[in-house]
Amino acid sequence: MSNYNELIGYVSQSNMADPAVYDSISKWIDVDNHINYNIAQIFIDNRDWPGNNIKFWRPQGNGGKWRWMLYDTDFSFGVPWMGLGYNFNTLQFAVEENGPDWPNPPWSTFLFRRLLENSNYQHRFI
């Protein structure tokens, strides 16, 4: 986890609009995987995420990139959780800076929110 904590520290102290910063981050994470993972979670309307049911991994050794995996999606596809059903804005929920302690505390949306500050990442995500 020290590698991941180092990544988060770098992201928290960097200007995400800087292309050089984005290039550095892309050496830490599989950017395509991160984009696809977030698109999938938002598309299926997973309400038990991102602060819960989040798994990410990295191959051991030098050069391994962080990747995220989709799992435990039973609170998705419009489950009428909190009485909102299909009217819930999952994208807005996933980028809330001060979300509720469950299921999206600020730490769980931090990396995604910061990456969206970069125009290249944002363009690829959209």
Give short role names for the model-derived ranges:
Residues 1-126:
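Catalytic-core segments of enzymes that bind and process phosphorylated/nucleotide-bearing substrates
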